[in-house]
């Protein structure tokens, strides 16, 4: 999810409706659509973990506590990965790095950071690595669905111009309207499909770790297909394929280390 330096209007028209960058105000403080929907996604994802934990052989409270603890490195990692990938922009204005009013988070970094730190947390709470990350898959995909709605309202993660039948008139993060590939909706659809597949695997009693592995491969495949449709970001540090390869390598390594560290 990315956003450029200029601040576009808080409300954008879309046909007869409006796309709201700012959903509401709390004591004069504007609450942006992306952070608000991300928060809703995290809350819903937390309760999804609480619901599926027994089906994965985990105690509800232990799984919920681990999820809450790992939210912190996940959010920080998602932001850090994005900033490093766009360092050419952020190095000129360091105050923007942790500015909550703008977007800029990457799932890659969040998952890698949380995976790397999870063995310590899970061992302390007596949770199995594979079972927990199967449950966390539901949390992440649920959060992703809400976050992509936030991206759509905010205009970030926009698609590039489309002259084909696959396209909607949408704004980018600067408020420029044109017919684009609806990248946010495509990612939302991918998350729904992966979430449905994960539910099916849980229902048939798939081996522990299978849900996480299948979702990871499915997400990587979806990104390979969708990323070429995105609006090219300005002065990005690394290619998207390179970033995806690094993400898969780091995730695989962290998963192996976590599995061995917990012994299960």
Label the predicted regions:
Residues 3-264:
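Hydrophobic, membrane-interfacing alpha helices
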């Amino acid at each position: 999810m990315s956003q450029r330096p200029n601040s576009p209007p808080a409300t954008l028209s879309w046909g007869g409706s409006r796309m709201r960058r700012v959903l509401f105000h709390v004591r004069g403080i504007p609450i942006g659509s992306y952070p608000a929907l991300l928060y809703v996604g995290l809350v819903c994802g937390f309760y999804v973990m609480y619901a599926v934990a027994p089906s994965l052989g985990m105690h509800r409270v232990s799984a919920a506590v681990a999820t809450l603890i790992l939210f912190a490195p996940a959010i920080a990692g998602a932001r850090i990965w994005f900033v490093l990938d766009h360092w050419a922009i952020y190095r000129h204005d360091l105050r923007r790095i942790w500015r909550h009013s703008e977007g800029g988070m990457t799932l890659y970094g969040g998952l890698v950071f949380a995976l790397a730190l999870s063995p310590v947390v899970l061992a302390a709470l007596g949770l199995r690595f594979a079972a927990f990350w199967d449950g966390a898959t539901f949390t992440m995909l649920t959060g992703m669905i809400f976050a992509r709605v936030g991206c759509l309202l905010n205009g970030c993660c926009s698609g590039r111009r489309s002259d084909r039948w696959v396209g909607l008139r949408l704004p980018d993060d600067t408020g420029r309207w044109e017919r684009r590939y609806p990248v946010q909706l495509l990612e939302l659809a991918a998350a729904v499909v992966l979430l449905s597949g994960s539910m099916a695997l849980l229902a048939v009693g798939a081996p522990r770790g299978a849900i996480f592995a299948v979702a990871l491969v499915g997400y990587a495949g979806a990104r390979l297909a969708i990323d070429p449709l995105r609006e090219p970001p300005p002065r990005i540090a690394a290619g998207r394929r390179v970033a995806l390869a690094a993400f898969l390598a780091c995730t695989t390594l962290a998963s192996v280390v976590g599995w061995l560290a917990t012994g299960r």
